[in-house]
C-alpha cells in the first residue's frame, strides 16, 4: 500500500496530474466518467460514476443499496492541490552573468524556507492549438528531472541566515532556471524547455513556439517520495507546506 501511495505522489505533483491519475484509477475499477451537462440515464444500485471539473477537481460517487432517507450517505473530501509557486506569464528574468530566473507568484501559503536549496521542477498544463482553431487542446506537463533551484546566499553574504530572515515573495524565492549560452536563447529558455518536454513525451507531435497559446505551470519538488527511519515507518513525500 505504501509503495502505491508513494508512486501516486511522485506522479501527482500538481492538482491537474492528481485528478488525471485518480480518474484513471477510478475508470480501472469500474467507475464511469459522466458529463454533468448530459442526462445520466438509467441508474441502479451499485453503479459508480465520476466527473471532473476544469481538470483540477474530481468527484466520485456510488449509488447505495438503500434509500438515502433510511441509510444516509457517507462523504469523504480532500484537496488535491498544495501550496507552491505559480510561474507568471513572460516569466524569464535575465540577471547578471546571463543567469535566468523565473518570476513567480505564491499559490496558497507555503513555508517558503523549505523550498530553498533543493532540486525543483515544473508541472502543470499547457494549452496548444488544436486541429480546430476554436478548440485548443490542453496537455499535461511534468518534467521529471531536476530543473530549477531557489538558492540561499552563502553565509558570508548573509550572516543572519540562522537567526531568522524575513523573505520577500517578490525577490528572494525566484527559482534559477539556467544560463543563456547564445543570444537566441534570450527570452526563449522556458519555452524551449516546454517544447522539448512536449515533443519528447507525446508521440508523432512536433510543437513549435507559435503552437503554445498559454500555460499554467507550478514549481514542484523533484525529489522522489520515500520512506525512512530504522523500520521505514515514516514517509517523506513532497513539499506540501
Q: Where are the regions that the model predicts?
A:
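N-terminal capping segment at the start of a domain
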Residues: 1-16, 170
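Conserved small/polar residues in nucleotide/adenosyl-binding loops
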Residues: 237-241
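A generic, well-ordered mixed alpha/beta core segment in the N-terminal half of proteins
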Residues: 72-159
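Soluble metallo-hydrolase cores and metallopeptidase-like ectodomains found primarily
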Residues: 18, 54-60, 66-68, 129-130, ...
Amino acid at each position: 500500500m505504501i509503495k502505491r501511495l508513494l508512486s501516486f505522489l511522485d506522479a501527482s505533483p500538481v492538482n491537474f496530474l492528481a485528478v488525471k491519475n485518480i480518474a484513471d484509477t477510478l475508470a480501472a475499477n469500474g467507475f464511469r466518467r459522466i458529463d454533468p451537462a448530459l442526462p445520466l440515464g438509467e441508474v441502479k444500485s451499485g453503479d459508480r460514476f465520476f466527473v471532473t471539473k476544469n481538470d483540477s477537481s474530481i468527484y466520485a460517487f456510488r449509488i447505495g443499496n438503500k434509500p438515502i432517507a433510511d441509510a444516509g450517505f457517507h462523504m469523504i473530501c480532500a484537496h488535491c492541490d498544495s501550496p507552491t509557486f505559480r510561474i507568471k506569464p513572460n516569466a524569464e528574468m535575465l540577471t547578471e552573468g546571463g543567469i535566468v530566473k523565473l518570476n513567480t507568484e505564491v499559490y496558497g501559503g507555503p513555508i517558503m524556507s523549505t523550498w530553498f536549496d533543493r532540486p525543483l521542477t515544473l508541472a502543470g498544463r499547457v494549452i496548444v492549438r488544436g486541429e480546430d482553431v476554436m478548440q485548443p487542446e490542453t496537455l499535461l506537463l511534468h518534467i521529471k528531472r531536476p530543473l530549477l533551484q531557489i538558492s540561499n546566499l552563502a553565509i558570508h553574504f548573509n550572516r543572519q541566515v540562522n537567526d531568522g530572515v524575513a523573505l520577500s515573495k517578490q525577490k528572494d524565492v525566484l527559482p534559477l532556471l539556467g544560463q543563456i549560452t547564445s543570444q537566441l536563447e534570450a527570452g526563449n529558455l522556458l519555452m524551449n524547455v516546454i517544447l522539448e518536454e512536449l515533443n519528447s513525451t507525446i508521440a508523432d507531435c512536433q510543437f513549435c513556439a507559435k503552437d503554445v497559446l498559454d500555460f499554467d505551470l507550478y514549481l514542484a519538488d523533484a525529489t522522489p517520495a520515500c520512506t525512512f527511519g530504522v523500520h521505514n515507518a515514516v514517509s517523506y513525500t513532497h513539499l506540501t507546506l
